[in-house]
Amino acid sequence: MNSQDLKKRQEKIRNFSIIAHIDHGKSTLADRILEKTETVSSREMQAQLLDSMDLERERGITIKLNAIELNYTAKDGETYIFHLIDTPGHVDFTYEVSRSLAACEGAILVVDAAQGIEAQTLANVYLALDNDLEILPVINKIDLPAADPERVRHEVEDVIGLDASEAVLASAKAGIGIEEILEQIVEKVPAPTGDVDAPFQALIFDSVYDAYRGVILQVRIVNGIVKPGDKIQMMSNGKTFDVTEVGIFTPKAVGRDFLATGDVGYVAASIKTVADTRVGDTVTLANNPAKEALHGYKQMNPMVFAGIYPIESNKYNDLREALEKLQLNDASLQFEPETSQALGFGFRCGFLGLLHMDVIQERLEREFNIDLIMTAPSVVYHVHTTDEDMIEVSNPSEFPDPTRVAFIEEPYVKAQIMVPQEFVGAVMELSQRRRGDFVTMDYIDDNRVNVIYQIPLAEIVFDFFDKLKSSTRGYASFDYDMSEYRRSQLVKMDILLNGDKVDALSFIVHKEFAYERGKIIVEKLKKIIPRQQFEVPIQAAIGQKIVARSDIKALRKNVLAKCYGGDVSRKRKLLEKQKAGKKRMKAIGSVEVPQEAFLSVLSMDDDTKK
């Protein structure tokens, strides 16, 4: 094809993704679009739905490799090339969405006709607006008995500020309104800009590891053209590779002769190591490189850290390989080796949020069959020392000596909670118990309220979402983003077993709650840790000061069983002998700490914060 033909073809390309709150019908709509454009035959559709979707539902990972090319013949008789870029995985927190949106010009916003706008809908819309995308509102599930499309239309206009007068009323399940959606994509989503004749530039928005072909990049071509035999170069590290294959997904991988400006597809170039490619990097040609990198999606910094240790220590190398493979698809996962006296060798991992942490843990256990121990998640604190240094600390065991600390700052998030009016009291009570500061409250409609709080991230990290759901009978939806660092009265609490610090049980706590929290943890550990042959004191300490203590009584054999009657001094001698043995045992004995003990430090019953 000459450049004239390629430019004509480019005008027919439409790149879009579907954004929606969970369960508003994103996947069903994607399936209907695949069916309507005859990308997948109805026979395969059934199989694909069952296979990929179950997996995606269950594990929160993407369908195959998530950019699908469709051909659609519009009412004007022209055939258009659509690229549906599925927002990967759960869109529970926005970290994955941003990279899909960076490859699009338009987004279909799906809103449930019965439930209306939810917190994550808003978060994703703002992301799409930041990327200057054309947003097409679709009000889905209009065939539900509780559907109220007009109310939702007003919500979209009032809350988001989008013109919803032309919003498509659809039911993905029943196949209503699908054609209208496709026509709107043709009319309203702009064709990709970019120049076929310019030096080749492509944005990597995902990648996957194939045991035979190495790392396969998923790219959006911004300028120029790429074909097998070209030598490509990564702009972040200058490494070069020979392209062996390019192609598109339909959802199966289909090889092509070339990929040109505006295309979304894959590039295989025998890239062996995971570290050579990063999502968000720019690819160009080695012999005619582009002048500058694309401003891709921004690198996200981890907000939550936790230690991951294999239960069987000989699985350490397997765990490293598994983390490297996961990191390939997930540029935001960070890890570095660490050792713990209690748990042996493992890794300190950084995650973007709790959902991210759960998904990674689940994938490690399922896909790689590694049994893990996770330590308590913690956040990044800014510790200012007396010699005017600022240290970033994400692991409680790295906290400097309390005498060197001038003050500590902790991250706060802006939490947006949407909830029916009757539960506003419960939400405010929970947020205040978690040291939240009230910011504002808006009514979305007669019944639903958007409450905004500033809450320390450390208070959200563990079970805030579960508590929120249970106190609002599951009606609340919640989203948060980083706000700022603030000074706080924080202290590090150590747990001592038999006089020894257990590094994996240390945690950071607000001074106000330290005493109660120490007391509760000590009592919990007393119930969980099995009794030993000797007495074990459990202590909670801040610096040198012990704030709580509880003892696990020793198991003891009845050494007097064989003394029938007899002299009291004989009995005393046996008891003294037992006591000396216990004392010796205590001096050298170490205490086995079961996995539940690490988790119990986390699941603080809420009565600690009343």
UniProtKB/Swiss-Prot annotation:
Matching Gene3D superfamilies: 3.30.70.240, Elongation factor 4, C-terminal domain, Elongation Factor G (Translational Gtpase), domain 3, P-loop containing nucleotide triphosphate hydrolases, Translation factors
Keywords, in A-Z order: Cell membrane, GTP-binding, Hydrolase, Membrane, Nucleotide-binding, Protein biosynthesis
Pfam families hit by this protein: EFG_C, EFG_III, GTP_EFTU, GTP_EFTU_D2, LepA_C
Cell compartments where the protein resides: Cell membrane
Disulphide linkage map: none
Membrane topology annotation: Peripheral membrane protein
Keyword Protein biosynthesis included in the entry's annotation: yes
SMART domains documented for this protein: EFG_C (SM00838)
Principal EC category: hydrolase
Binding site for GTP: D23, H24, G25, K26, S27, T28, N140, K141, I142, D143
Gene Ontology terms, MF aspect: GTP binding; GTPase activity; ribosome binding; translation elongation factor activity
Gene Ontology biological process terms in this record: positive regulation of translation
Domain tr-type G residue range list: 11-193
InterPro entries assigned: EF-4 (IPR006297), EFG_II (IPR041095), EFG_III/V (IPR035647), EFG_V-like (IPR000640), EFTu-like_2 (IPR004161), G_TR_CS (IPR031157), LepA_C_sf (IPR038363), LepA_CTD (IPR013842)
UniProt record similarity statement: Belongs to the TRAFAC class translation factor GTPase superfamily. Classic translation factor GTPase family. LepA subfamily.
Role description: Required for accurate and efficient protein synthesis under certain stress conditions. May act as a fidelity factor of the translation reaction, by catalyzing a one-codon backward translocation of tRNAs on improperly translocated ribosomes. Back-translocation proceeds from a post-translocation (POST) complex to a pre-translocation (PRE) complex, thus giving elongation factor G a second chance to translocate the tRNAs correctly. Binds to ribosomes in a GTP-dependent manner.
Protein name: Elongation factor 4
Protein's organism: Streptococcus pyogenes serotype M49 (strain NZ131)
Gene field: lepA
